[in-house]
């Protein structure tokens, strides 16, 4: 078990990119607990990761949907990678799904990569599924949730871009989302609302991640 208190400053560390994984055979050896971020293309995964670790350009952001085409691994800097000196956590930025304009063979490759990773990674502690707060859970999102349920992978919903809607609309979105999760066995019941642009909800997300890897 990792001590929660000893990790409290981890998001003040400098973080670095260590590996891009284009296919499942390039995955790094299983080591530290992994926290993955999944979501539709352009939902704001890379922006949220940057805001989470207080670095503007750690994860590459783009207005072009489908920019993230690999599993991108990030860890706190300063660890050697030796078994006795592994980083306490790795963040994984997953390829966005639901991008219809990409070539079919590319979409198929992304889909296979996502599904293979989610099914077989024992060090994966939780997937944060990012949902645009303006739109709620769409068909592609529901398909990922179904996969996570079947694979018994713990996941939690994070609403992004929450500053783009009125607070009353956001409150209703949270209620609606909670209702949709009631019959999903792998879903963590608490919904997190965030805004990368306004730094809203980030402390709650950091705390949730730390509690997850401390178990």
Curated annotation (Swiss-Prot):
One of its GO terms (molecular function) is metal ion binding. GO terms for cellular component: cytosol. Pfam families: MMR_HSR1. Its cofactor is Mg(2+). It comes from the Bacteria. Gene3D superfamilies: P-loop containing nucleotide triphosphate hydrolases. Mg(2+) binds at residues 46, 68. One of its GO terms (biological process) is division septum assembly. Keywords: Cell cycle, Cell division, GTP-binding, Magnesium, Metal-binding, Nucleotide-binding, Septation. GTP binds at residues 39-46, 66-70, 93-96, 160-163, 194-196. Residues 31-215 form the EngB-type G domain. InterPro entries: G_ENGB_dom (IPR030393), GTP-bd (IPR006073), GTP-bd_ribosome_bio_YsxC (IPR019987), P-loop_NTPase (IPR027417). Belongs to the TRAFAC class TrmE-Era-EngA-EngB-Septin-like GTPase superfamily. EngB GTPase family. Necessary for normal cell division and for the maintenance of normal septation. This is Probable GTP-binding protein EngB. It comes from Bartonella henselae (strain ATCC 49882 / DSM 28221 / CCUG 30454 / Houston 1) (Rochalimaea henselae). The lineage of its organism: Bacteria, Pseudomonadati, Pseudomonadota, Alphaproteobacteria, Hyphomicrobiales. The gene is engB.
């Amino acid at each position: 078990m990792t001590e929660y208190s000893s990790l409290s400053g981890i998001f003040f560390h400098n973080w670095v990119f260590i590996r891009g994984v284009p296919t499942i055979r390039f995955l790094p050896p299983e080591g530290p607990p992994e926290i993955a971020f999944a979501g539709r293309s352009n939902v704001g995964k890379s922006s949220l990761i940057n805001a989470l670790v207080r670095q503007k350009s750690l994860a590459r952001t783009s207005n072009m949907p489908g920019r993230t085409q690999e599993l991108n691994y990030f860890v706190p800097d300063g660890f050697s990678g030796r078994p006795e000196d592994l980083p306490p956590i790795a963040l994984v930025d997953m390829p966005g799904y639901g991008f219809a304009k990409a070539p079919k063979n590319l979409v198929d490759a992304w889909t296979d990569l996502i599904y293979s990773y989610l099914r077989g990674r024992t060090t994966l502690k939780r997937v944060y599924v990012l949902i645009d707060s303006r739109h709620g859970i769409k068909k592609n999102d529901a398909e990922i949730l179904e996969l996570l349920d079947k694979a018994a992978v713990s996941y939690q919903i994070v609403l992004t871009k929450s500053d783009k809607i009125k607070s009353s609309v956001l409150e209703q979105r949270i209620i609606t989302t909670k209702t949709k999760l009631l019959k999903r066995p792998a879903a963590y019941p608490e919904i997190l609302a965030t805004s990368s642009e306004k730094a809203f909800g980030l402390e709650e997300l950091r705390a949730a991640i730390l509690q997850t890897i401390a178990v």
